[in-house]
Amino acid sequence: MQTQDKVLILHGWGGSDAPHWQAELASEIAKNYGTVSFPLLDNCHFPSKNRWIKQVKQILEEFKPDTIVCHSLANTLWFWLCHEEGMQTIERLFMVSPPSLLTEEKTIKTFFPCALPQNIYAKEVQMFVSNTDPWVKMEEAKRVAKHYDIPLTIIQDAGHINADSGYGKWDLIEQLVLDKS
């Protein structure tokens, strides 16, 4: 990451406040003089796809990120945004724990089902899932990665890769986003 890069971190259902790895990542970017936006999306515990799309489109327009880091439902949100007109291509997209495109959960039902967009609007994409994620089966995660011809990292026994599964500070994502070797 160059100090002029702008990183947008998008949380999933319920937010990603500390000690979640996304909160830790936002802090690390700021400590390294990076430019980061880590907004709390509207009504995060009872999200609406249309409200989130509207909010994030405005953030994209105003902040103009180079890198976007999505966790969970934010990946589905990104897919919906990619169906919208006028999307600009970003440099890097990190997709962590995307849920099934056919998720059946009453509280987030406006997001599903979701079709894969033709264009993912990112020059470089990396996807991370866990073999024990309750929100997606490995076969589906592999199909999504293959569809976009993107690298898929499968982390063993990491649940939904969130604070509840032990992912507060996550060195790997920090190294990748900050381009540390």
Predicted stretch roles:
Residues 15-16, 102, 131-136:
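Acidic catalytic loop of the alpha/beta-hydrolase fold
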Residues 26, 131-151:
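Conserved loop-alpha-helix segment in the C-terminal half of the alpha/beta-hydrolase fold
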Residues 34-37, 146-162:
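Catalytic histidine neighborhood in serine/cysteine hydrolases
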Residues 47-48, 158-169:
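Catalytic histidine-centered segment of alpha/beta-hydrolase-like enzymes
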Residues 68-79:
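Gly/Ala-rich beta-loop-alpha elbow adjacent to hydrolase catalytic centers
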Residues 121, 126-129, 133:
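Short beta-strand/loop motif that positions the catalytic acidic residue
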